[in-house]
Every structure is written in C-alpha cells, then in structure tokens.
Amino acid sequence: MEAHISVITLAVTDLEKSLAFYRDGLGLPTKGIIGTEFKGDKTHPSGAVVMFELQHGLILALYPRSELAKDANLSVGVASSTEFSLGHIVKSKQEVDALMKRAQAAGAIVTDEAHERPWGIYSGYFQDVDGHLWEVIWNPNVG
C-alpha cells in the first residue's frame, strides 16, 4: 500500500459559518454544501458536507461535529486546538503576513503573530472559527 492522505475532515460546529470562513474569508474554491439530500436521524449521520479540492487531489472537508461522531460510531468529544495543526507553506514572508491578516479579517483568532523561528522559518498560527489550528509558513529551504 502506498501511504498518502486523500481527505482531511474537520469537525465543525456551524457548517454555514465554517463554509463562509474558508470560501469567502480564505478564498478556497468549493461547490458549497453538498449532500443535503441525505437526511440523518438519531443513529445515522446526515450527508451535508463541504469539500475544497486542494493540490494533488487532496480534499479538505468540513463536516458537522455531531454527524462525524455518528458516522464514526463515537460520542461527540471535547474539541481541542492542541491535538494537531495544519500547515500552509507560502512563497514569502509577505504572503505569510497577508494570509494571517486575511484569516483574522475573516474571523480567525491569531494565537501567535508571524515571526522568525529559531530553526530558520517565518511563521504564525491562527485558529479558524471552530478552533482548528493553522500555521502559515515561509521556509527559505522549500520551493
């Protein structure tokens, strides 16, 4: 089996609000909320989801927290921003600063302003409207 990740699904509290953040705030292209024809019930999840096609076939999906829990046969857990971060590499320090400002204007909470890190990168962190942690990175040694 070749190891690769095809879909990253983020559990969200408000699908419309999260859609607006990523589509309107960050500018990610999407068809919007799809799968609304699949109605859920107490034990079966609904199908409403948002998908963003990223590079190399990677999909970023947004799925209501309660529906993701049902789909995986789990209880809804407590959200934590320190479990993982998603990194986005850009081509310059100026792009880091611009994306951090754009995210903040769209409703993100900047948790760590962009600055030089001891290991040679320039990056900053923000939380999206559901608390998911993103790092925007310029690495002079990459691309």
Regions found by a protein language model. Give the residues of each.
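Basic/polar N-terminal segments that are highly enriched at the extreme N-terminus
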Residues: 1-3, 143
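Core segments of cupin and vicinal oxygen chelate
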Residues: 9-60, 66-67
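A short, acidic/glycine-rich surface segment
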Residues: 37-40, 67-74, 112, 143
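Vicinal oxygen chelate
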Residues: 5-13, 50-54, 73-143
